[in-house]
């Protein structure tokens, strides 16, 4: 069940927007005022785009839909928002990597530049279940366990 509330995904969207804005900022071709408008518009666009595709109880569900992708072709959401601040397609292609994948999922935002690049995590938060004492595989590794606890079933036969 999707929560449908924009506030549930604000940290993840803020991380994605901040990352994309920083990529535009590094070239120095976009003014801070235009970046501010871009960031606000992108935050709104992503919140609207993801609102029925956000599943905190199953973070990987809908991941492909939420993925922001530039593969020599500009992601349509980035393209639309950039046009609001007067950035053309050729300008966008000069400012952003030619290959970028940005995954915006509940509890984690990560990216990869290039097809063979390493995946880097921008934002990570423990799911609510993990913070309530339930051990996930990842949490067990962090706690130093080499494998999950084993449950044994004893059967008695006569």
Swiss-Prot record:
SMART domains xrefs: btg1
One cellular-component annotation, GO: cytoplasm
Phosphoserine found at: 147, 149
Keywords carried by this UniProt record: Phosphoprotein, Transcription, Transcription regulation
Effect the entry attributes to changing residue 53 to A: Impairs interaction with CNOT7 and CNOT8
GO molecular function, one term: transcription corepressor activity
InterPro entries in UniProt: Anti_prolifrtn, BTG, BTG-like_sf
GO BP, sorted A to Z: anterior/posterior pattern specification; associative learning; cellular response to phorbol 13-acetate 12-myristate; central nervous system neuron development; dentate gyrus development; DNA damage response; DNA repair; negative regulation of cell population proliferation
Subunit structure as annotated in this protein's UniProt entry: Interacts with PRKCABP. Interacts with CNOT7 and CNOT8; indicative for an association with the CCR4-NOT complex. Interacts with PIN1, inducing mitochondrial depolarization.
General function of this protein: Anti-proliferative protein; the function is mediated by association with deadenylase subunits of the CCR4-NOT complex. Activates mRNA deadenylation in a CNOT6 and CNOT7-dependent manner. In vitro can inhibit deadenylase activity of CNOT7 and CNOT8. Involved in cell cycle regulation. Could be involved in the growth arrest and differentiation of the neuronal precursors. Modulates transcription regulation mediated by ESR1. Involved in mitochondrial depolarization and neurite outgrowth.
Designated name of the protein: Protein BTG2
Species, as recorded: Homo sapiens (Human)
